[in-house]
Amino acid sequence: MAFKDTGKTPVEPEVAIHRIRITLTSRNVKSLEKVCADLIRGAKEKNLKVKGPVRMPTKTLRITTRKTPCGEGSKTWDRFQMRIHKRLIDLHSPSEIVKQITSISIEPGVEVEVTIADA
């Protein structure tokens, strides 16, 4: 069989738009908000659809322990706590553009988790 020329030009495949959720967690609020602002600014420069940052409830981890190691003396206690702050950012874009946006410098102590789903 011979190849038939139909006269049609090949159609470029559409770039797949994904729903991307970026989860940021940190113990320091200032560095967390700075990274959020940088990510959102980068997404707005690329004209992407952005939702967030959604501020999730702060988790407070508490430990109460005796001050004295030997058990002698009055019963005095130390109370320690650590607060973990969390932000969610949703983007609707191709995954290649998100790689460019997330390549910004991220503050130390901020953990970034990227989840990609089909739109």
Swiss-Prot record:
Listed InterPro entries: Ribosomal_uS10 (IPR001848), Ribosomal_uS10_CS (IPR018268), Ribosomal_uS10_dom (IPR027486), Ribosomal_uS10_dom_sf (IPR036838), Ribosomal_uS10_euk/arc (IPR005729)
Superkingdom: Eukaryota
Annotated effect of mutating K8R: Enhanced readthrough on the poly(A)-stall sequences
Main location: cytoplasm
Residues that bear N6-acetyllysine: K34, K75
Modified residues (N6-succinyllysine): K8
Effect of K4R: Enhanced readthrough on the poly(A)-stall sequences
GO biological process: cytoplasmic translation; positive regulation of signal transduction by p53 class mediator; translation
UniProt keyword Ubl conjugation, yes or no: yes
Name of the protein in question: Small ribosomal subunit protein uS10
Source organism of this protein record: Homo sapiens (Human)
Lineage, top ranks: Eukaryota, Metazoa, Chordata, Craniata, Vertebrata
